[in-house]
From Swiss-Prot:
Belongs to the AcpH family. This is Acyl carrier protein phosphodiesterase. It comes from the Bacteria. It is an enzyme of class 3 (hydrolase). Keywords: Fatty acid biosynthesis, Fatty acid metabolism, Hydrolase, Lipid biosynthesis, Lipid metabolism. GO terms for molecular function: [acyl-carrier-protein] phosphodiesterase activity. It comes from Photorhabdus laumondii subsp. laumondii (strain DSM 15139 / CIP 105565 / TT01) (Photorhabdus luminescens subsp. laumondii). Signal peptide: none annotated. The keyword Lipid metabolism applies. The lineage of its organism: Bacteria, Pseudomonadati, Pseudomonadota, Gammaproteobacteria, Enterobacterales.
């Protein structure tokens, strides 16, 4: 799961949006560094990641990638799930629009950035102003995201090429998303992520 999915699942679980979005920028035990609700959000994010990485449908999705790109498939999948969520937001969340959700999330996070990791603050400088979460619906933007990550992290250079597997198996990824993401939504609504190991 990437930024949009983590924020959405956090909302369904009544969990801290700040903690859920920031979790990848926090190393080790967050206890004592942040408030209890933010810590709970960080822990929820980590549980979502564990369940995502080990779920049979996600493992099935990884095998759609060619050998050259399978090593980076988990990262590419995180981004492609956000693509399908952004693209299909109105079907999954008919009660309020994606722009309204993003406005709400931003209002919950930006006032607290001053005490968050510097790299997280840098992310927020682009995430909201450049409308990433809305632009995820555009496959061309997904390609740009993967190229940018590959450029910034040479060890992950295969990310750029992994986009061709997205194009080749797009219908398969779409079908897997519709099996997997509603399941994750249900677990979030049932607060099940509080009961899973990190």
């Amino acid at each position: 799961m990437n930024f949009l999915a983590h924020l959405h699942l956090a909302t369904l679980a009544d969990s801290s949006l700040l903690g859920n979005l920031m979790a990848d920028f926090v190393r080790g035990n967050p206890e004592g560094q942040y408030s209890a609700d933010v810590v709970a959000g960080i822990r929820m994010h980590r549980r979502v990641d564990v369940l995502t990485d080990t779920h049979p449908l996600v493992i099935q999705a990884r095998h759609l990638f060619s050998n050259s790109y399978r090593r980076v498939a988990p990262i590419t999948l995180d981004i492609i799930w956000d693509h399908f969520l952004s693209l299909n937001w109105d079907k999954l969340v008919p009660t309020y629009s994606l722009p309204a959700f993003i406005h709400h999330a931003r209002s919950q996070i930006e006032p607290h950035l001053y005490y968050t990791p510097e790299k997280f603050q840098e992310l927020n400088a682009f995430l909201w102003r450049q409308n990433w979460l809305i632009r995820y619906a555009d496959l061309a933007f997904i390609a740009d995201v993967l190229k940018g990550m590959a450029r910034r992290h040479p060890r992950l250079s295969a990310l750029s090429g992994s986009f061709q597997d997205i194009e080749q198996h797009y219908a398969d990824f779409d079908a897997l998303f519709w099996q997997f993401y509603p399941y994750m939504m249900e677990k979030a609504e049932n607060k099940d992520f509080y009961c899973l190991p990190q």
